[in-house]
Each structure stands twice: as C-alpha cells, then as structure tokens.
Amino acid sequence: MLKAFRHIYFVSIFLALSAGLHAQDLPSLGRRSGITSGTFPNGISYYLVSNTYSKGYANFALIQKCADNQEDVRASLDYDFFASKGVGYTPDGYISYAGGSAIFNFEDVPTYRSVALDSTIILLFNLVGRHKGEQAIVASGDLDVARLKDRLYIMSLTVPKRTPTPEAPEYEWKPSSAPRFIHYGNGCNSLAEISVTYSSSRIPRKYMGTPQPLVTNMFAHQLGYILRKRLEELFDSNKVPLAYVRFKYRDSASTDSDETFTLMAGVADSDVREATRLIAGVLSDIDRNGVSAEEFQDAKARFQTAMDRSADAPVTNREYVSSCVANYIYGAGIVSHKEAISFFSGRKIALEQDRSMFNRFIAALIDPARNLAVSYGTPSDSLDTDALKREFQAAWKNTPVRTAYHVKSNDTLALYYPVEKKMKIKSEGIDPQTDGTVWTFANGMKVVFKKTDDKQVRYAMMIRGGYTEVPDISEGESAFVGDMLGLYDICGMSPMRFRNMLEANGITMNCEVTIADMCIRGTAPADKANLLCRSLLSIHKNRSLNKEAFAYYKSCEALRQEDFRHSTDGINAVTDSIMCPDFYYPVTKTVEKLGDDLPEKAEKYFAAQFLKCQDGIIFIEGDLNPSSLQKILVRSMGAFRTGKAFSVRPKVEYRLRSGWSTYTVDKTDRLIGAGSGANLALAAERPFTMQNWCAFRIAVEYLRRELIKDMAPLGQYFEIYPQLQLLPVERIAIFVNCSPCPSAGLPADVEPADPLEVVSRMRDALPRITASSLSAETLKGLREALAKEMAGEASDPDYVMEAFLLRHSEGKDILSNYSTYLSKVTAEDVMNVISSLDRGSKVEYIIK
C-alpha cells in the first residue's frame, strides 16, 4: 500500500513540517517575482517576463488547450514569415504537444527590430483567432513588459471571448506488479547503456503549487547523488569500466503521465551481465537498509550546494517559457531557485527525522519488481533479456552486506596545513580589466580578488607552461595531461576519496592543461576558502602516483570517448581534427594514443610547474570578506614553492587544411554522431584584434539569420557554435549542426529533408551569403544586440574570469573597452569575416 500511495505519504511530510495542517491546507509557494501574469477579459491568459539573459531577443509561446489535431495546427503556419524575421525552428519545430494542448514556440525573435516584434504579435493573434478554446501567450526576453501588456490587451479586443475548455480526463495511476526488461540496438561499437526506471503516480494538480513538488525534487536529486557515488565506488573496486552514471527525474511539471526516476550507467558491452549484478546489488541494499546518517548528510550538503550554484545562475528565456507553460497546462508552481532555497532553509527538521522520511521515500519507490523497467541499449541486435532478468533478481536477493561509503568527516584533517612562515603582502593595486584587487606577495605570487555577491566562490590557479613542456610527450597525449593530476593519492587519500572529500564540502576542482599553461579551477562555498587553500597545497606538496587509478581511468576513458563521439561536441571535435590534420597536440582525446608511461612524464611536468608558482596568477571571485581572505592567503602563500624559472610561449607547427572536404557515414556504422544529421565546419586564420572579434560575432549572427531562410523549407533545426583560437595560431571557426525536426512540429507544407539535401543547400548558401550586402539598418540592429550581449557578459562572473585568464594566458583582452571597438565595426569588416571563412577550410560531415 505504501508504494501505491507514495504521494499521499508526502502530504504527511508537510504535516510534520506544519503541525495541525490538513492535506487541503498545504501552503502555496506563490509565483516567482518578475513574472507578470493574468487574463484578459476575453479569456486569453498571459505570462510576461523581462529577462536580459539574451540581449536584444525574446522567446514567445502560444498555448492552445484541446488543440491536438496536428493537421489543423500545422496548416496554420507559414515558415516564410518567420524565416524572413530570423526566427528558426526549435528542436521540436514550431509546434509541440503536451497535456492535450498545442504549444507554438518562436525563439530568438529579434526585439531590437520593431518590425519583427510587431509582426510576431500580429501572427500570435492570427493563431489565437483560429482556435476557439482557452489559450495563453507567454513571452520572455529583452522586453518592455508594461508596453507589451498594453499592446496584447489592445490586440485581444479583436478576438471573441474564448470558449471554456472541457475538463480533461482525470489522470489514473496504473501501478504494475511485474518488471519489464527491454533491449534495443544503440548503434555503438562497444558501449552499452543500462537504464533502470521506476514509475510513480504524478502529483495531483491541486498540490502542484505547494511545497510538495519541491520536496519530491529534493529527495529525487539526493537519491540520484547517493546512487551515483555508490555505483562509482562499487564499479571502481570491482574494476568494471564505467563511462558514466546519470540520474534523471521526470516530474509532474514536464509530463501529463507518470513521474519517472531513471538511473543510467554506461558500460562495456562485454560487462553488461556483471554491471547488471552490481546495479541490482546497490538498489537492493538501499531498499533494504536505507542510507546512513553520514551518507544522508553528505547528500543534503551536495543538494544545498547545487541549489546555491543555481541561485547565482542566469535563467534562460527557454527556461522561463517552459515553467510558464507548465504552470498553465499542469498548474505547476513557478518558483525561483532563491525562493526554493528560502523554503528549504526554513525546514526545521532534525537530521534523523529527515533521514527517516528519506528512507521511507526510498522504500516506497525502489522494488525488485513493482513499477520497474530495465532497458539495455547495446551494439548487438539481440540480447537474452530473460537471462539478465534472472541475474538482476538473483543479485537483488543475494546482496549480503551494505555498500561501503567512503566519505569521512575527518578526511579534511589529513590535508596539508601550512606551517611555513607567513608571507607578507608586498604591494596592493587594482586590476584594470576586472576592477579586482591585486595582492602581490613577497615571494612573487599574485592574487586577484574580485568582490561579488555570489555565495559560490569561483577560483583559478594558473601557472604558465603547457603540455609542450611535458618531457618526451607523444603525439596525441596532450589531451590527457590535465586528467593526470586527478589520478594521484593526496595526503594518503585515494583519488576517489579525495574527490569525495571535496564534493562533501561543496568544492569542485578540475585541472586543465593547454598549450600555454596549467590551470586548476572550480567553485567552492564562501565559508570553505581555507579548506580550498589547504586542498590546493595538498596537491602541491603531498601527492603520489596511483598506477591502479591510471589503469582504471584508461579503461573507462575508452568508453567515455565513444559516448562523447555520439554528441554534438564529439562531431565538432572530429571535423576540427579533419581541418587540422597531423597536429601533434590535439585537444581531442584518442585513447589509442594514451601511453602507459604518461603519468610518469606528467609528474615531471607537474613537479616543474609547482616549483615556479610565481610564474602565474590566482584569481578569486565571490562573496568573501577581503580581510578574512587576506589572512588565509598570508598564512598559505608561503607554502607554495617559487623560483626564478619562467615559461616562454611555445612555437608549434600548425597547418590548417585548405579547401572543401566531405565525409559521409551511415548512422548504423557506429562511428560518429547519433541519428541523421548534416554538419558543417568553417575555419580561417585571422589575426586577433578586439574589432575583429566583434566583427566575427556579428558575422556569426548574420550567418545564422541567413541560414534560417535556407533551412526552414527543409525542416531543419540547427545551432551555430563559434570558436576563437589564439594558440598556436590565431584562428576563427564556426560549427553548424543540423538535425531534422519531427514532422508534427513543422508547417503542413514542410517535411524534414535528407541530410544530403541539407548539406547541398548549405553549400549553395555560402556563396550567396558571401556575395550579399549587409545593409546599414541590419548592421545597426546586429551591433545594438551585440552591445547589449557584451554588456551582460561584462557583469557575468564566469565570463569575467574567462576573460581574465585569457589575458594572462594568451595576452588577449576580450573585455576592456568593448563598446569602443564594437562601434567601429563596419559592414565591410563583417563581410570580410564571412569571406575569409568561405575561402578557408571547410568540412561537411554527413550522418545518414
């Protein structure tokens, strides 16, 4: 009964939170600030958001209830109208369907062009007039909300009152008692994925605006974190290679069907049986025994850290629109991350009581049979799922002991504590690029601190000298050097235990080694600054090679690379490597080129780097007290080794292939990419100046708008990824990735085209765009939009840190005085960029 009534049980959670409340008295969370909503007299609802995430652009949506006749809906659209305004398809086309409603989505409408905004509003009401039922208009972006609301109201007067929508059939939860084991071919070479999905009753609409979805979401994410950590440790201890562990919770705000909780593991095809046994064992253990207090405390801390990070993250227009759509269709609450944090911080529940409720949540959800589906995606066309089902059930039944949990609160005591003499600050100044405070210490080390309101501190420790300085490095090993620093025992802790200790304290840490430098970077809670310094010092002074960790890393990396090659980034990495053949230091990983002696070679490099910490800089950005941070740094800086050695910028041979190359692969060949698609890469050597950089960014947007006209009749969604490279040569590149939209989301006279036709159209489009003229009006609009975007970047902590590191690493400034350089960009500058790309290296990569 507990499993069948899991959400009724969640009402009891809130009874514990608010003594004396009845189920019908669950408090409403209200709506996030910044959203203007209501209903016009004729019954049309509206949700309007002024959001500066994407300067100069806005997303619009129209929701029509009970408008699920796809033929009628598709017939109402004309792609020419939107394409001429620079508005392309979303991944679903212009139309998607959810909860018995049709949803029209128009993204990146250029609001800096009044004609585009006016035309979009007119079109929305043309669509409104074609459907008599209840409807809602959603808009999020660079908008004057008060003015937009007035315009929508005036337009609404031209439309008759809406007919009330009939009540939708009541949702019925249909639990299952027998597990389902499913197999499908995944088109890979050796990578298999095991997915374990538990279904659960959706939250009733009357509770969607209460804290109940927040608590379900919190427990789901805590469960996902615990399962990931347990599986990673168990696979590691059993030396079973693991590409990834992922967890996905599909909540009631994103579907009109059951909620689902899915655990996914990427493993070798040859290890499917053993992986099944291990996964079943972990699930059985957590079902029988729940989680320990220490493990639950760790999961709570990780969830809180994730919430803190998301509170500082900007909200995209797509995210705003999605949450408003879910509110209109499903009654979902629209709560900001900060409001959610406020709710969770107000939950005055003792740890043991909270853990007890969490364990009851686990017991209600996880079961060896009920509401369970296990899916296997493998390279083979057939699989004995009956045998795997028996393996799963046997492992569940025979799990002998609890899974070990290796995060201990006293692990931090093992970290290095600085005993060296305090290092005085020799001078203090202001960094001209970031306006941060520069502290120069007596040993030559420099720290730049920029005070912000972010509770999550961003940090980076950069030391000049990149992978060209690794002794005897072999061709292709450069891409792996940064990973080697994560394979050391630190202060007696294994690599995994050290990572767990950092994660338990909310600290992220990654090492990146480029052609120019080494950089250790990440985030940390503001109250963990001292622990962060001790962790960096521990890597610096007390590390030892762990050869077993490297061997396991190499076996896992082979699987991770196959997973990566099926992604958009993987496709672009392949096309990039085609344009730059025989480059000795590629950034793309090829595990066949990873030598077993790289850890020893990398250690010589790291040892040399850590002897010259003065040849670099530390950047810290966040809500820290400057005086308190100074005390930590004065105590810590003397423990870092410094010397007189300095690195010089390397000279490396680099050849960009000229001309046009075409590669065609069958999607069943299990090579690169997933599904059908057309991909195009363009690159050209071009000297970097700030004016050229601004011209390149305008050119990318102009190309996007022009390509929309060519891709719209072919039913293609596409994205453009611009790339700036400064070393070993100054180069610009763009990567265009096209994928077919579903027919149901396209206008009636459009069907998704074959990838070969898509590439042919792009091939013809380039000369046309290159020969076109950029009008003064268009340039002005594009320049104004970019000015707004760059103004937003100048206040974005992540972008500021990237710009700072780029200046200190490669000597180029992409932040200072941007408006001056942008104002100087001419139409000729923009067209020269496009022309150089058209004359440069071009690669077509077709998956059919």
Describe every region a protein language model picked out:
Residues 594-598, 602:
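Alpha-helical scaffold elements lining the catalytic groove of polysaccharide deacetylases
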Residues 1-10:
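Bacterial N-terminal signal peptides that target proteins for export
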Residues 9-18:
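Bacterial N-terminal signal peptides
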Residues 216, 220, 224, 431, ...:
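Long, His/Glu/Asp-enriched segments that create or flank divalent metal/ion-associated functional microenvironments
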